[in-house]
Each structure stands twice: as C-alpha cells, then as structure tokens.
C-alpha cells in the first residue's frame, strides 16, 4: 500500500469519475485505474462500483467503511510534513538548555530573552546544575546545549570556549580585606572561607589555586549554592571566591580582584559529540557567542569595590 494510492482513492471518491479524477491528479486514466485495482487486490476488497463505460463510480460498502481511514492517513501525512516544516523553520519545537547557577542570571537569561523574542514558538526548558552533572545530562540527551566551565574531559561532549570569567574575593564591607584594591591567593592562607558544595566548579577552581600557591584557607562553611554563599559572606561568616558576574548589582558586598595573572575560569558551550546540534540550539549558541562582543558578560572585576 502506497500513500499515493490512497490519494488516488480519495480523488476518485470525491470526483465519482475516473477520468475527472485522473485529470485532477495529472495522470493518464488507465494508470489511475491500474493503481486502484492494485490497491483493491492488496486489500482484498472492491472499493468502487464500476458501471459500464466512463460513467459515475460509487464507493462500495467496503469503500465507504475504509474512506474515513484514508482521510485520516492522508491528513496525518500532511500534518507530519507541516510539523517538520515548522520545526526546521523554528516555528515550533522544544529546546533544553543547561547552565551553572552563576551563568544563568548574567549570561543565559539575556540570551534566552532575545531568543524567545525571535522564536516565540520554541518552548524553552532551563536546567540548573554544576558542569559535571550537565555533562551527564548532555550525554543522556536530557539537555541539548549547556554552558559549562572547562576543563571537560568526557569524550562524548564537544566544547567551544566562549570567554574567560574573572573570579573575585567577595567580602562584607567591614571585612579586614575590604579596603584592599587587590588580593593575592596567598592572602587566603588561614582566611575563613565560605566554600561551595562538592562537585561545584568554583570549589574545584578555588581549592586548586590554593594548592598551587601552597596555602590552606580555613573552611568555615561548605555545601552552599551561590545565593547561600553570598548570604553567608554578607552575614560576616567569611569570604568567598566567586565569579565577578555572580555579584548582584545591588549587592553591598565588596568584590576584590586578584593580583595578576588573577584567577579566572573558562566558560564554554557544550553539546553532545555524536549528534548534530538542533537548529534551534545552533541559533541560541550563536547568540551566546555574540554576548562577548556586545560586552554583556561581566563588568571589569575591579569596578566592584
């Protein structure tokens, strides 16, 4: 059974005439008659009552019973084509994007607003997690695209570096270091430090920097997310190493840059290596890459004191 045969059945049923149906379909009438006969043979039933000559034809009882199914199959086929055209044209669809908490607010959010304005029919799902968890969700297909922090070693994920994100030391206004214009990693030695939870990119970056400088901070709190860490810092519990972009504009905290070469992390766009990137994801990726040129990522770290 072929789709075109079903279309022929519908045309003959509507025209009630083989010759008129053949003209409508731009077919030779014998070819149309043969296709209908082949379908009837395959189904084992006659679909049309054929009168003598080239007169009107009518559906048999079996043809009447099967015609609604013909309508349904042809309508569903057209719907499949229309939906595919809508998806490739980004009229409709779904896009799942992951990012670390600090990247959602200042990087992903403005890009998603712009994307939604351009493609309002695309449903957006946002997943907030650490880079390692996001890599797992990429490889499992749970997310299409993710903003992660390098390095990523999973061979199943391809990454494209976007920008270097400077890190600062966040302290309360009355903290002894608040008067400093810059701090050294060595200044973290013995310093009460509020630390992010295990698996958090910033925790790994901070501890690696301390090991490289042979310093040992005093961890007064561990296991927090970004909002909790900044709240503990504001309460005077300790300092925290955070991305400059994570500092709220209305924050009273002091953000002190590190002396050169400073501390930073590399933010990258990641996707599954063994699959083509969906068109909608490619469009969003282009917008995220363009954020660098439009200076929407982060203010200079030294501007927050």
Where are these regions (language model features)?
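Short helix-boundary/capping micro-motifs
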Residues: 12-31
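A short LG(V/I)-centered, amphipathic sequence patch enriched
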Residues: 40-59
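Alpha-helical linker/hinge and terminal dimerization helices associated
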Residues: 42-45, 66-88
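Central regulatory/effector-binding core of bacterial HTH transcription factors
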Residues: 90-155, 216, 223
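Short loop->beta-strand "edge-of-pocket" segments that line small-molecule binding or catalytic clefts
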Residues: 96-98, 167-168, 176, 183-202, ...
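Hydrophobic hinge/microswitch elements
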Residues: 130-143, 148-149, 197-256
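Beta-alpha-beta core module
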Residues: 155-161, 165, 180, 187, ...
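Secondary-structure junction motif
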Residues: 192-213, 277-286, 292-303
């Amino acid at each position: 059974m072929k789709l075109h045969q079903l279309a022929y059945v519908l045309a003959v049923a509507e025209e009630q005439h083989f010759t008129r149906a053949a003209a409508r379909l731009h077919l030779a009438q014998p070819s149309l008659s043969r296709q209908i006969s082949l379908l009837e043979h395959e189904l084992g039933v006659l679909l049309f009552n054929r009168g003598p000559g080239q007169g009107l034809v009518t559906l048999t009882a079996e043809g009447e019973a099967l015609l609604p199914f013909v309508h349904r199959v042809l309508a569903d086929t057209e719907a499949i084509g229309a939906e595919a055209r809508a998806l490739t044209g980004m009229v409709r669809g779904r896009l799942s994007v992951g990012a670390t908490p600090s990247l959602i607010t200042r990087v992903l959010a403005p890009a998603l607003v712009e994307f939604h304005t351009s493609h309002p029919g695309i449903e957006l799902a946002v997943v907030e997690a650490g880079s390692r968890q996001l890599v797992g969700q990429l490889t499992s297909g749970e997310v299409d695209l993710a903003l992660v922090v390098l390095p990523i070693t999973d061979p199943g994920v391809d990454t494209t570096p976007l920008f270097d994100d400077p890190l600062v030391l966040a302290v309360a206004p009355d903290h002894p270091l608040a008067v400093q214009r810059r701090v050294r990693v060595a200044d973290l030695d013995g310093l009460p430090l509020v630390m992010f939870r295990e698996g958090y990119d910033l925790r790994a970056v901070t501890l690696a920097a301390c090991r490289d400088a042979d310093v040992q901070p005093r961890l007064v709190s561990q296991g927090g997310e970004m909002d909790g860490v900044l709240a503990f810092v504001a309460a005077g519990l300790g300092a925290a190493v955070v991305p400059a972009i994570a500092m709220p504009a209305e924050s009273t905290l002091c953000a002190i840059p590190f002396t050169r070469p400073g501390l930073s992390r590399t933010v990258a766009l990641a996707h599954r290596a063994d699959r083509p990137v969906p068109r909608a994801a490619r469009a969003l990726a282009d917008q995220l890459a363009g954020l660098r040129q439009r200076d929407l990522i982060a203010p200079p770290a030294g501007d927050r004191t």
